[in-house]
Amino acid sequence: MADDMVYQEAVAAEVIQVSGRTGVTGEIFQVRCKILGGKDTGRILTRNVKGPVKVGDLIMLRETEREAKQLGKRRK
């Protein structure tokens, strides 16, 4: 089965803002990132990232078509 998998190139993106945390335990960060390569160079996306991340980090995105929904306000 591994032979049938097709390799997709990843695109580098730089984290420019950490917007907040999401997920049941807050393990997912919502970030705004600037695409550094590919057909969407210069585009700014909102993405959800798993794991620790800070402004200035480089992340590799498998695709640049989808964008995460904005976080809603927390209800009390």
UniProtKB/Swiss-Prot annotation:
Keywords: Ribonucleoprotein, Ribosomal protein. It comes from the Archaea. GO terms for biological process: maturation of SSU-rRNA; ribosomal small subunit assembly; translation. Transmembrane segments: none annotated. The keyword Transport does not apply. Coiled coil: none annotated. GO terms for cellular component: cytosolic small ribosomal subunit. It holds the Pfam family Ribosomal_S28e. Belongs to the eukaryotic ribosomal protein eS28 family. NCBIfam families: PRK04007.1 (NF003080). This is Small ribosomal subunit protein eS28.
